[in-house]
A protein has these predicted regions:
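Short alpha-helical segment that forms part of, or immediately flanks, the ligand-binding pocket
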Residues: 41, 63-67, 81-82
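Short hydrophobic signal-anchor/transmembrane segments that target glycosyltransferases
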Residues: 1-9, 14-19
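Acidic donor-binding loop of glycosyltransferase active sites
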Residues: 45-57, 70
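Short hydrophobic beta-strand element within catalytic cores of glycosyltransferases
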Residues: 67, 71-75, 84
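A charged, aromatic-enriched C-terminal amphipathic alpha-helix characteristic of glycosyltransferases
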Residues: 110-147
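Nucleotide-activated donor-binding/catalytic signature segment of Leloir-type glycosyltransferases, i.e.
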Residues: 19-38
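Short alpha-helical donor nucleotide-sugar binding micro-motif in glycosyltransferases
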Residues: 42-47, 134
């Protein structure tokens, strides 16, 4: 999709398919392999968006991108639906096909995103915030069940 649109794409990570993917990557795609955390932060800082094409139960990398003020273009299944907000923190593509991704990339080009809203949204998933929300929920349910009023 990025090759067809002439967009640069940097891919981070390795795995069993690395050599195969590197061989089929076109002129605008660069596979970087495994990189350290400092380099990942530099990549987030220098990118226009983070592309999240996989389906995972909960992906932390889209939140890392948002915390860096970068929107996410994600496959609209799995954990991305919990972390990406259409039009606010990114956009989705519906199928894992070149055409669907091209549509999302073109749509993305017409969108604008507020870096501060992206960061605020990512902070909602911070460990301490999450723990505090869980604790408050448990306390509320305990109090309801035991007739305790605040």
């Amino acid at each position: 999709a990025c090759n067809k649109l002439g967009l640069k794409l940097k891919v981070v990570g390795d795995g069993p398919d690395y050599k195969r993917l590197k061989a089929m990557a076109g002129p605008t795609v660069e596979l970087l392999g495994r990189v350290d955390d400092a380099h990942v932060k530099e990549l987030y800082a220098g990118c226009r968006a983070f592309l999240f094409p996989g389906e995972e139960d909960f992906g932390i990398t889209p939140l890392e991108a948002m915390a860096s003020g970068r929107p996410v273009i994600a496959y609209g299944k799995g954990g991305a639906l919990e972390t990406v907000v259409e039009g606010v923190t990114g956009t989705f593509f519906k199928e894992q096909t070149t055409d669907s991704l091209i549509d999302a990339l073109r749509r993305f080009e017409t969108m604008t995103f507020d870096k501060h809203k992206l960061r605020e949204h990512a902070e909602k998933f911070d460990d301490e915030v999450f723990k505090a929300r869980i604790k408050a929920f448990v306390e509320e349910k305990y109090n309801e069940r035991n007739g305790v009023q605040k």
